[in-house]
A protein has these predicted regions:
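An alpha-beta-alpha
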Residues: 67-106, 199-211
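Short acidic low-complexity segments
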Residues: 115-123
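Flexible loop/hinge segments that line or gate small-molecule binding clefts
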Residues: 25-64, 161-172
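Hydrophobic alpha-helical segments within soluble ligand-binding/sensing domains
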Residues: 48-84, 137, 177-196
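Single conserved hydrophobic/aromatic residue that forms the stacking wall/gate
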Residues: 1-11
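Periplasmic-binding protein-like
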Residues: 16-25, 82-88, 125-134, 156-158
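Short, conserved loop/helix-junction motifs that constitute active-site signature segments
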Residues: 34-39, 77, 148-152
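Flexible loop/turn connectors
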Residues: 123-128, 135-211
Length: 211
């Protein structure tokens, strides 16, 4: 059963379910309601940069793993004049990624920028963009087709979290992503066996023609 943000805390304090699979909506803190759940019954997914106590979890690392994924692409990124992270003000993505983005760019001497007002982004020749949300990917591709700029040649594009569409858009969009199938397998294993699991999935690079 899917439980939305308006769910009652009674759900947590009861024995309605044998297992709870929860994707926390804050990377920095755990909802206090969840502390009412027996740790043997709860699995936390995705966000998790907080004290998870005795709870099982399968989380993303939005910091070091993000840095190392960018480092794996450094030679491709050097083809461009500037690396731009699109980070809308209202995004749920952890802000700590911005710090590690800045660290990467400083360590490898790459000119960079973080853009929060993504509605006004102008695609420019010589820049490579990291788009966390799919809407920014779509807007950049649409704008480039209007201006005649070619993705992977005139400018670069990196998306976050892989989808089947990214494999075919403009001959393939390079992606930074965890293995979502592996996350699903580990969640199913927890439900079926009840065995404790505490792991961060690595951010993988799917290199395609967009950079």
């Amino acid at each position: 059963e899917m439980i939305g943000s308006d769910w009652s805390s009674d759900v947590c304090s009861s024995d309605l379910y044998n297992k709870y699979i929860v994707m926390n909506f804050d990377n920095e803190k755990l909802s206090p309601h969840l502390y009412k759940i027996d740790s043997s019954k709860l699995l936390l997914l995705d966000f998790g940069k907080f004290d998870k106590k005795d709870y099982s979890y399968v989380c993303q690392d939005f910091d070091d793993s993000f840095y190392h994924a960018l480092a794996a692409l450094k030679e491709h990124l050097r083809k461009y004049q500037r690396l731009v992270l699109l980070f809308p003000e209202d995004i749920k993505h952890p802000r700590s990624s911005c710090q590690y983005f800045n660290c990467f760019c400083q360590d490898y001497h790459i000119d960079s920028a973080i853009v929060e007002n993504t509605d006004r982004i102008q695609v420019r020749k010589g820049e490579v963009y990291i788009a966390i949300r799919q809407i920014e990917v779509v807007n950049i591709i649409k704008q480039s087709r209007t201006t005649g700029l070619k993705c992977g040649e005139d400018f670069g594009l990196i998306a976050y979290n892989d989808t089947p569409a990214y494999e075919v858009i403009d001959q393939g969009i390079t992606v930074l992503s965890i293995n979502w199938e592996e996350l699903g397998r580990k969640a199913a294993e927890f439900v079926l066996t009840g065995q404790e699991i505490r792991t961060y999935l690595p951010t993988e690079v799917h290199l395609r023609n967009s950079i």
